[in-house]
Regions:
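Short, Lys/Arg-enriched N-terminal segments with co-localized hydrophobic residues
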Residues: 1-15
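Nucleotide/phosphate-binding sheet-loop regions of phosphoryl- and nucleotidyl-transfer enzymes
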Residues: 14-332
């Protein structure tokens, strides 16, 4: 019995002492490129980019091992194990960004992203603009002088959080998306066809109706506490490791389930602040044929999901990319 007790004590000490959170920012990082098994591809590369001087928003990565602990120990225990380290890491971001998580006048907003050791594009979930609520959005509007940007970001956040964390994302193609249904209804009422034609007051109305939909579908009010939002998002990313899309993709690609996913939390950088902001994606090689050619695409005044949503046509980053895009377009016209 004594030996059993000692082994449990040793195990509990190991569980409590294990490093689970790795920070990065301001040219420093606790991780590096060869730690992708522990930090995932995204977390390891974010750390390495900091170390080589690439300007990267500060943040932290929760290890892939915690994903396994999430399924072994449960949500409450994992939050307990992470709480002190995550709060310390958030304080580090606050210091580097000169802003405060959950603060009304000078808010820090963050993104929460997945990151397995092997690339699994589009299979798991992301949440942007986390930290907003009805008071913080007004503070962000005053701070930036851009109410449309602030309320547009809030609208996106409520929709993404509802989809990813609260489970409101449609499962099948025939399922009705409650948020898209509301957007279409408001556009019809306002007599516009495009999302970007909606005014600030329309965006406020969208947020109001979104939160009503959350209450009706989940029985819960939309969370207003920044840390409650953060823990919900972190755990949702871990849950997404076992969603149907991810499981099927892993089977196709031969990726073991026990690898797990890391979670990277970063200070937000906004591509939707106006015509001098943009979001995009780039590659060091041509994804179609493997050619050693830098390429990519971007959208002005947009956020990440807009690039892949197919709602707007992105621009090519390079001149040769634009030329090739034009050639392909002409060939389709001739067909």
């Amino acid at each position: 019995m004594r030996l059993h007790f000692l082994s449990e004590l040793t195990l509990n000490t190991f569980i409590m002492d294990k490093k689970r959170v790795y920070t990065f920012g301001n040219g420093q990082a606790e991780g590096k490129a060869d730690m992708r098994n522990l930090l995932g591809g995204k977390g390891a590369n974010l750390a390495e980019m900091n170390l080589i001087g690439v300007p990267v928003p500060p943040g932290f990565t929760i290890t892939t091992e915690v994903c396994s602990e999430y399924y072994e120990l449960g949500k409450d225990k994992v939050v307990e194990l992470l709480k002190a380290d995550v709060e310390k890491a958030i304080a580090n971001i606050e210091n580097l960004m000169n802003s405060k998580f959950g603060d009304v006048e000078n808010p820090l907003l963050v993104s929460v992203r997945s990151g397995a050791r092997a690339s699994m594009p589009g299979m798991m979930d992301t949440i942007l603009n986390l930290g907003l609520n009805d008071e913080v959005v007004e503070g962000l509007s005053r701070k930036t002088g851009r109410p449309r940007f602030a309320w547009g970001s809030y609208r996106r956040f409520v929709q993404m959080y509802g989809d990813v964390v609260l489970g409101m994302k449609p499962v099948n193609k025939e399922d009705i998306d409650p948020f898209e249904e509301i957007i279409e209804k408001v556009k019809e009422e306002k007599g516009v066809k495009l999302d970007n034609e909606l005014e600030v007051e329309d965006l406020k109305e969208l947020v109001k109706r979104f939160k009503v939909a959350v209450k009706e579908q989940t029985g819960q009010d939309f969370p207003t506490c920044a840390y409650e939002q953060l823990w919900g998002a972190i755990c949702a990313v871990f849950r997404s490791w076992m969603n149907e899309r991810a499981i099927l993709y892993r089977k196709m690609e031969g990726i073991p389930a026990e690898w797990g996913t890391a979670v990277s939390v970063q200070a937000m950088v906004f591509g939707n602040m106006g015509d001098t902001s943009a979001t995009g994606v780039c590659f060091s090689r041509d994804a179609g044929n493997g050619e050693d050619l830098f390429n990519g695409e971007y959208l002005i005044n947009a956020q990440g999901e807009d690039v892949v949503a197919g709602i707007r046509t992105p621009q090519q980053i390079t001149k040769i990319g634009s030329q090739r895009w034009a050639e392909r377009a002409l060939s389709l016209i001739h067909i």
